[in-house]
Amino acid sequence: MATFPEPEWMERYRDRVNADPELEVIGSWFTASLSFAFGDRRYVVRVERGRIVDVNAAPRIDSRASFGFRAPMAVWAKFVSPDPPALYHDFFAMLMRVPEFVLEGDGLVAMQNARALHRMMNLMRG
């Protein structure tokens, strides 16, 4: 079993996202690069039409992303747990109430794709 947030876990996450029928419908306009910083580990994920087409597990400092999410591992561990505690059950709740969970970059791009992004984030619990 792949351990969060190792590259194998990200591959499984990519497969869940790409196989999700809901994202196939609501993600058709979601095209962007986003970053996930899980403590010290950072990934840049490229999404095209709601599908993850590339996972960069070793991005250089100049790897670009439209927006991203950054938090300590303890915060992410609560979010990806099968039964997350209050405030960690939804990334919108975390943005509002968990100061360590940070949206970086262009928040407008993130919110323009809020529904697809919300589904994509929830699939982390797969």
Question: What are the functions of these language-model segments?
Answer:
Residues M1-G126:
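Feature captures hydrophobic
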